[in-house]
Amino acid sequence: MSEPLAPVRGIQIEIPGSTNLALTDLLIDFTGTLSLDGLLLPGVPEALIHLASTLRITVATADTFRRASEALQGLPLEVRLVDCGEQKARIVDELGAEHVVAVGNGRNDVAMFEAAALGIAVLGPEGAAGVLLQVADVVVPDVYVALELLLHPRRLKATLRA
């Protein structure tokens, strides 16, 4: 299924004029965020492996194409199957909402974004739900930029400062 999760360093982000962030967990959607038509986007596994030394990674997915578990097998993350957006929000709460960064693109990610300390909406090849953009803290063109922001968190300072 998935590899054992190792201890993480976390990400500290000092945001001038706003609340500082102390992130330990990434909760990320699969369909349309990490994948296209149920297949992982090129380069995503390597980025997730790199990021796993900094954040614990949980993939929460309705698994529209029924390929998530197979596609993510062997990566240092946990896969959680969900039926609705409220279940994603409950996972945020389980992880400790004040320490969670959420990444997604769909309508069923809205509650997850509202519960998380930081929400990054991904436009990507499948687009993004308009309602999600209204609750996102940051909007990026694709998952690669989202993961790069977490690998280089100082880049978030300018976007999030008050």
Regions found by a protein language model. Name each.
Residues T19-G38, F113:
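Asp-based phosphoryl-transfer active-site loop
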Residues R56, D63-A162:
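C-terminal cap/substrate-recognition subdomain and adjoining C-terminal extension
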Residues A6-V8, L21-D25, P42-E46, F65-A68, ...:
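Short amphipathic alpha-helical segments, especially helix-boundary/capping motifs
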Residues I11-I15, I28, I49, I57, ...:
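Weak global preference for isoleucine
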Residues M1-I28, A162:
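Non-catalytic pre-domain segments flanking phosphatase-related domains
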Residues E14-I15, N20, D37-L55:
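Short, acidic loop-to-helix structural element flanking the phosphoryl-transfer center
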